[in-house]
Every structure is written in C-alpha cells, then in structure tokens.
Amino acid sequence: GERILVAGGRNPFDLGKNGTSPTLGLSPDDFVILLTHTPDYAEDVPVTNSDLILAGHTHGGQVTLFGLYAPIVPSHYGQRFLSGLKYNSKNIPMIVTNGIGTSQKAIRMFAPAEVVMIVLHRLTD
C-alpha cells in the first residue's frame, strides 16, 4: 500500500467497551501503526492488520534489579512485555517504551526514562 495509518483505542483497560481493535476494518495493504497505552492490549485483543504496535505503561519496570528483572510489572504477562522490541503471539512487532514518567512513586532504578525515535523505511524490491 501507499499509506501509513495510525490507529488507537480509547481505553485499553476496559475491554468490555474497547475489546475490538480499530485496526480490524483497515486494509492489509496499508502500513498500520497501532498505538496503545498497555502492551497487554496487543495480546488480549485481536489486532489484525497491525504492522507495528507502540505501547508503554510498564515504565520498563521502573525499579529493576540491574535492569534484568523487575519485581513489579503492571502487566498480566509479567516480564514478557517489559521494555524494548517484543512480539505478540501473532508475531507482530511491538515497541514498548519506558516513557518519561513514573507511577505512584517518583523513582526509577535501572529503568531509565526514554524517548524513542522510530524511523520507517519503505521496502524496496
């Protein structure tokens, strides 16, 4: 396709109201970027026609043991979607960022704040 489309859900925590991905009605010929607050959404909801998923919510664990393990991760999937390039069960790439904020406690240990720049390149034959 010729287009890059950006889609997102309103509240990824309320699957009763938002349990249908906005990407389902989009063309598989377009490159679709799905924005979601939590990476769990990309696993709990069929995100058909998504080519790239961008998520946050985990803060990279916020407080980790030397960046290797986070005792508390706000995800049903534990360490699986902690931070970085991940793939959901449908093998769709998902970038989970640490973000720049914190949750209830304004502290970070071995989970630095980050702003991620993503550069897309057209595939050539």
Across the structure, where does each feature detected by a protein language model lie?
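Conserved beta-sheet core of the metallophosphoesterase superfamily
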Residues: 39-117
